[in-house]
């Protein structure tokens, strides 16, 4: 969708066209703000944070295990739309509404992210729509 030109200045000016493409899929919930579901740029895939909204119904399941599962499936749908899988993920950032859910969240997360990418997991005060978790990922394209 967007082509950008990156220039590196040193003794010489080197310009390289970097393809930047928006990722969009109906298999993951649409953005609830002014952002895209994901982007590919420079050989990487970046997903926006995925909350546990069922893309078909808009429903949010109850409990951390069900919500973690849906968030992982939403991330997977965006990765799939970019032509990659969970095995290409190199970094995730996970947000929990309650750090007490850490163990239960990890149990579900580990079933999807079997290659054990680098990860940050933090508890936050609030998440959109009152959900219990959110996951964003960076993958090799």
Identify the residue ranges that each predicted region occupies.
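Acidic, Ala/Val/Gly-enriched low-complexity intrinsically disordered segments
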Residues: 2, 16-19
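Short, small-residue-biased leader/transition segments that mark boundaries at the very start
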Residues: 1-8
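Short, polar/acidic, helix-capping and beta-turn segments at strand->helix junctions
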Residues: 19-141
């Amino acid at each position: 969708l967007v082509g950008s030109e990156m220039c590196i200045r040193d003794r010489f000016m080197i310009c390289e066209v970097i393809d930047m493409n928006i990722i969009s899929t109906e298999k993951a919930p649409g953005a609830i703000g002014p952002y895209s579901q994901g982007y590919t740029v420079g050989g990487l895939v970046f997903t926006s944070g995925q909350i546990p909204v069922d893309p078909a119904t808009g429903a949010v399941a109850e409990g951390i295990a069900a919500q973690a599962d849906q968030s992982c499936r939403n991330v997977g749908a965006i990765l799939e739309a970019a032509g990659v899988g969970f095995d290409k993920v190199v970094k995730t950032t996970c947000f929990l509404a309650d750090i007490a859910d850490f163990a239960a969240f990890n149990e579900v997360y580990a079933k999807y992210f079997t290659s054990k990418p680098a990860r940050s997991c933090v508890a936050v005060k609030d998440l959109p729509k009152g959900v219990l978790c959110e996951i964003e990922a960076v993958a090799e394209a």
